[in-house]
């Protein structure tokens, strides 16, 4: 298979740094424009390209790195010696092309598909700078092909030619593209590895696949970074809307499946599509890419058009838009009101006197049947009448309008009888009646059913009988029982009212205590007033002498400091009380 890859290397292009989107990478990976300019220019072939920053797995080299307004742009080449290693792990019938649709893929294109989706990002490795250090020409270490780099906007675009890789970036100006084309043409003799170690490549790829299994939002990240890099029409990267390849689903080889395989195109629906269970067994899809894209959008063919665009009767709409259109259509149907019939229909209704057979006795859904007079201007009392419209073989059963219905009556209501005795019969549009929509009637009926069920349930609970255990609705649970077996019931907090109720003290005892306290307070105030004229210094001396005498008589232990402190506290309180009494007396 490697002999069919008729080129020596593949071009790869992409941004290594997007200056305006470096917040998520962290300060350690932040690279300013001044630092990039200090490390430029780079000589072709001096910076290697490897896989997942593995120095032992070099697969290409960098041709040039340019400082552009959006960020640091890289152009390099990758050896096609990777092609036989990649394609050896793909079954022969997995990659296919529909010749009838004009999709013929070469081995180079198949390799580009695999490379674009297995290693879709670029990652720059640079030397760690000291504080206030200016980068030199050895600042850039290598460029890695990886799953997702730390820096945002670093999407790798591969191509068999330089124009195919560079042309995917819409923000590049014409002079910049011409400069890159010139470098690619001049440096196309850059040395790339002609032979690669299969065990080393296999080890690195296995390591990458294991790490990539934990990237749940890989497709979303790729699409976001693709927009940051101004890549809107990639050719091979399948985390997008335009693809040119499908991976065939394994099924039994039967003539029916073979026909389906030839007729069904490469489009696929998202994983949440409501029509997923109705897909044919032989439908081609991209299961390996569905988990990566997670985009919920339909895939298209190589030229960007629909697979069945030649029929000009198919329009591809995103699933979210299709669901919103269905919801809006349902709301419009529910909000419609009956319209008045035309005069021709009223005339045909009045002139028709035939009787419908029981099998054709239909009635619009959602409307209540009248008990006596069922239709407008029937030929007689309690007569089942249907207008001539219902005898039309093309009639599909939808009631065109709601006729005027008079209340129940015992008089015949034939139009001739009514006009000869009471004048002209009123037309169908004379008395417009506002009928509720089907949606409103459904909601009202559901509410009525719910209320009836609740009332029935309450009635059943009120009629509960201990003698009939089958009517027992629920087990009686005490407040002290645990909810789960083995669960400890927490002790309930007892309120003040419950404490008073438990003590059962008479109310009079509390009032007596309050009165006793008031009398005691009055006595203390009177004593303080009489003692306010005494000398505070002599009083203090007496207290100190008494305390010294008491302390001398007692033994020295740990309680003596406490007693001295209590005496000082009492003296302080007396002084405050005396001052308060003096203030009240003044």
UniProtKB/Swiss-Prot annotation:
Active site: 53, 123, 142
Sequence similarity: Belongs to the herpesviridae capsid scaffolding protein family.
Gene3D superfamilies with a match to the protein in the record: Herpesvirus/Caudovirus protease domain
Alphabetical UniProt keywords: Host cytoplasm, Host nucleus, Hydrolase, Phosphoprotein, Protease, Serine protease, Viral capsid assembly, Viral release from host cell
One biological process term in Gene Ontology: proteolysis
Biased composition (Polar residues): 264-284
Residue numbers spanned by region Interaction with major capsid protein: 566-586, 567-586
SUPFAM superfamilies: Herpes virus serine proteinase, assemblin
Organism listed in the record: Infectious laryngotracheitis virus (strain Thorne V882) (ILTV)
Keyword Transmembrane: no
Short name of one Pfam family: Peptidase_S21
Taxonomic classification: Viruses, Duplodnaviria, Heunggongvirae, Peploviricota, Herviviricetes
Protein name from the UniProt record: Capsid scaffolding protein
Gene Ontology, cellular component aspect: host cell cytoplasm; host cell nucleus
Top-level lineage group: Viruses
GO molecular function terms attached to this record: identical protein binding; serine-type endopeptidase activity
Region Interaction with pAP, residue ranges: 312-331
Positions marked as site (Cleavage): 239-240, 558-559
Extent of Basic and acidic residues compositional bias: 251-263
EC number: 3.4.21.97
Region annotation (Disordered) ranges: 251-288, 330-364, 458-486, 530-586
UniProt entry tagged with the keyword Hydrolase: yes
Domain-level remarks: Region of interaction between pPR and pAP is called Amino conserved domain (ACD). The region of interaction with major capsid protein is called carboxyl conserved domain (CCD).
């Amino acid at each position: 298979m490697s002999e069919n890859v008729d080129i020596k290397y593949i071009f790869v292009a992409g941004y290594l740094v997007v200056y305006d989107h470096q917040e998520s990478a962290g300060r350690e990976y932040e690279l300013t424009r001044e630092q990039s300019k200090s490390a430029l220019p780079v000589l072709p072939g001096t910076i290697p390209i490897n896989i997942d920053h593995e120095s032992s797995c070099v697969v290409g080299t960098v041709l040039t790195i340019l400082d552009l307004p959006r960020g640091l742009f890289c152009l390099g080449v990758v050896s096609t010696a990777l092609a036989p290693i990649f394609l050896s792990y793909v079954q022969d019938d997995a990659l296919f092309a529909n010749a009838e649709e004009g999709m013929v893929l070469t081995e180079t294109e198949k390799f580009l598909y695999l490379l674009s989706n297995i290693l879709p990002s670029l990652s720059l490795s640079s030397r760690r700078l000291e504080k206030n250090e200016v980068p030199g020409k050895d600042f850039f270490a290598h460029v890695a092909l990886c799953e997702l780099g730390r820096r945002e906007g670093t999407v790798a675009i591969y191509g068999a030619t330089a124009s195919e890789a560079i042309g995917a970036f819409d923000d590049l100006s014409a002079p910049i593209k011409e400069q890159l084309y010139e470098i690619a043409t001049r440096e196309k003799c850059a040395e790339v590895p002609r032979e690669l170690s299969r065990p080393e490549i296999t080890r690195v790829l296995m390591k990458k696949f294991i790490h990539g299994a934990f990237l749940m939002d890989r497709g979303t990240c790729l699409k976001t970074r693709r927009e940051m890099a101004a890549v809107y029409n990639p050719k091979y990267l399948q985390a997008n809307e335009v693809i040119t390849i499908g991976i065939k689903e394994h099924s039994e080889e039967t003539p029916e499946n073979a026909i389906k395989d030839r007729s069904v195109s490469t489009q696929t629906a998202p994983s949440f599509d409501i029509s997923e269970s109705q897909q044919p067994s032989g439908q081609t899809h991209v299961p390996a890419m569905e988990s990566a894209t997670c985009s919920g959008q339909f895939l298209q063919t190589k030229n960007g058009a629909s697979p069945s665009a030649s029929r000009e009767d198919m329009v591809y709409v995103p699933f979210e838009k299709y669901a919103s259109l269905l919801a809006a259509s349902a709301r419009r149907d529910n909000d419609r009101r009956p319209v008045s019939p035309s005069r021709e229909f009223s005339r045909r209704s009045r002139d028709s006197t035939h009787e419908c057979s029981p099998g054709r006795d239909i009635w619009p859904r959602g409307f209540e049947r009248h008990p006596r007079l069922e239709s407008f201007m029937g030929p007689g009392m309690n007569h089942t009448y249907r207008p001539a419209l219902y005898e039309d073989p093309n009639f599909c059963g939808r009631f065109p309008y709601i006729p005027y219905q008079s209340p129940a009556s015992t008089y015949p209501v034939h139009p001739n009888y009514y006009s000869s005795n009471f004048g002209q019969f009123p037309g169908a549009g004379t008395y417009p009646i506002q009928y509720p929509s089907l949606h409103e009637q459904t909601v009202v009926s559901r509410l009525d059913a719910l209320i009836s069920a609740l009332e029935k349930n309450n009635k059943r609970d009120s009629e509960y009988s201990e003698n009939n255990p089958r009517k027992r609705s629920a087990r009686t649970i005490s407040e002290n029982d645990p909810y789960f077996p083995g669960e400890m019931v927490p002790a309930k907090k007892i309120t003040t009212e419950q404490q008073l109720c438990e003590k059962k003290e008479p109310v009079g005892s509390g009032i007596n205590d309050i009165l006793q306290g008031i009398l005691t307070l009055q006595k203390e105030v009177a004593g303080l007033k009489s003692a306010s004229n005494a000398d505070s210094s002599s009083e203090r001396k007496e207290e100190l002498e008494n305390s010294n005498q008491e302390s001398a008589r007692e033994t020295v232990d740990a309680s003596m400091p406490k007693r001295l402190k209590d005496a000082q506290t009492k003296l302080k309180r007396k002084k405050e009380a005396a001052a308060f009494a003096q203030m009240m007396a003044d």
